[in-house]
Amino acid sequence: MDINNITAVYFVGAGGIGMSALIRYFLSKGKKVGGYDKTPSGLTEQLNYEGAAIHYEDNVDLIPDDFTDPAKTLVVYTPAVPEDHSELCYFRGNGFEVMKRARVLGEITGCNRGLCVAGTHGKTTTSSMVAHLLKQSHVDCNAFLGGILKNYDSNLMLSDKSDLTVIEADEFDRSFHWLKPYMAVITAADPDHLDIYGTPEAYRESFEHFTSLIRPDGCLLMKQSINVTPRLQEGVKFYTYTGAFDAKELSTFNFQLSTGSPDFYAENVRIGGGEIFFDFVGPDVRIPDIQLGVPVKVNIENGVAAIALAWLNGVTPEEIKHGMATFAGPRRRFDFHLKKENIVLIDDYAHHPAELKASILSVKELYAGRKVTGIFQPHLYTRTRDFAADFAASLSLLDELILLDIYPAREEPIPGVTSQIIFDAVTIADKRLIRKEELLDVVAAEAGNLEVVLMVGAGNIELLVDPVKQILDKKE
């Protein structure tokens, strides 16, 4: 099926952040768009407002007539939807073209110069930085992002003058293997999604295969410490980068490199007064006094990768400095909700032990000497089972921990796997395990003792951020 010739697109699992970018894309092309999701959300309601027709019951009778012609309708689904889903089975049994989200994204972007950002963590922020740097410059771009970029209040950007397309390359279910990168970034390859991959080795191999897809006239930019062996086609250039970030020594920025100097890096890093500045250094380029619009330490390495990709595609040093300073970040990626003298509230999407550690260390560096309280909701039973000890080690870096129940997402419970196995291994004394429904009462009771609060997780903890903010905002 030629995607350009269809008149209607139906999404099964329409509420996912990646699906929503495709929904917005097809709406912009004048297609009729509908779909199903399990639960309503602010995002699905916004998509309905923009012209989609999304319902919330798995019921074939609710599929509108606009989406019942197999010759004119494309059906897009996400791997999170179970195979026995009634609507999905209806479409498969009646001659419809049914494609995974990742394949459709690959079809849409395959003819463009794709700037694909992959990695266990850091990919949403880095791809959003790249998109903003290009969009606000003379270069311009299209973008399909995995987060709502606050500068544009969207995860989709379109351009009528540029074929550069920034793509968040998702490794879940090997989705990024459908892409055809012109340039690619790998920010991290810490094993994750072991329910899909089985072993850490298989997970890393998927990234190695991803590097083999880069066009011969393109390049790979990879964080230096990553344990991935690229399989590049002849002609593909290879660069390394680092953020000059030593997580073991909070106050020290240095390089402990075993493989030589990186091609791109930060130096002369200055942190203070809630701001971060650094100098960007690369082959034949040095840009002094870069200011991070989202001043958190982990964004130094994200920023180096984004600046390098922008510079390689013609963005000027002046445009880079302006873009980095004005970057507001994607929602739920180090998202400041309160930033007052007596209380700070940050919401972050971290849901893997490595990114959780980076988030906590970044907060402790930015607010040295102040008590940091973490409110963490584990995401998925399998991830909790596979990384319980690592989660506990990261959470033990906090001054105080409030741990919530596991958010199951697509999974059924696993016997013996609860937040308790993380809680028992956390080594700090100031910790408590509560149900999500108890959180607001706990925060209200403890508000006077809270200084810096970090709410973390990829589940529905985000629904509690505003209520927590309302409580803390009243703190004297």
Where are these regions (language model features)?
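N-terminal leader/targeting and accessory segments in enzymes
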Residues: 1-100, 104, 219, 250-260, ...
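Nucleotide phosphate-binding/pyrophosphate-handling subdomain across enzymes
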Residues: 2-8, 18, 25, 29, ...
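Conserved hydrophobic helix-helix packing surfaces used for dimerization/oligomerization
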Residues: 8-9, 75, 115, 141, ...
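Phosphate-binding loop of NTP-binding sites
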Residues: 25-31, 62-67, 79-224, 228-237, ...
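Short internal beta-strands
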Residues: 31-38, 220-224, 373-376, 398-408
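Short acidic/histidine-rich motifs immediately flanking catalytic phosphotransfer sites
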Residues: 68-74, 163, 449-451
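Short, basic, low-complexity termini and linkers enriched in Ser/Thr/Gly/Pro
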Residues: 230, 236, 247-261, 448-449, ...
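C-terminal helical cap/extension that packs against the catalytic core
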Residues: 392-450
